[in-house]
């Protein structure tokens, strides 16, 4: 199974319609990848579905980069899903 980082990046590519090479760990969803507020909501929903977890709104607001998404998912999903 792909690792968490690869799975997060795959979701970002699918949701934002960007090239895989644009999705670096440091990339900001809004500033670098062109996401708007609706895109970020849909991205969080897609991450929740991919990892079978719930990301509370107050936590989702703190996830602005690919690395922050990877870190959040890594810390909050059961090991069997990682």
From Swiss-Prot:
It is found in: Cytoplasm. Pathway: Lipid metabolism; fatty acid biosynthesis. One of its GO terms (molecular function) is phosphopantetheine binding. It comes from the Bacteria. Keywords: Cytoplasm, Fatty acid biosynthesis, Fatty acid metabolism, Lipid biosynthesis, Lipid metabolism, Phosphopantetheine, Phosphoprotein. The modification O-(pantetheine 4'-phosphoryl)serine is found at residue 37. One of its GO terms (cellular component) is cytosol. Residues 2-77 form the Carrier domain. PROSITE patterns: CARRIER, PHOSPHOPANTETHEINE. GO terms for biological process: lipid A biosynthetic process. SUPFAM superfamilies: ACP-like (SSF47336). Gene3D superfamilies: ACP-like. 4'-phosphopantetheine is transferred from CoA to a specific serine of apo-ACP by AcpS. This modification is essential for activity because fatty acids are bound in thioester linkage to the sulfhydryl of the prosthetic group. Transmembrane segments: none annotated. NCBIfam families: acyl_carrier, PRK00982.1-2, PRK00982.1-3, PRK00982.1-4, PRK00982.1-5. Belongs to the acyl carrier protein (ACP) family. Carrier of the growing fatty acid chain in fatty acid biosynthesis. This is Acyl carrier protein.
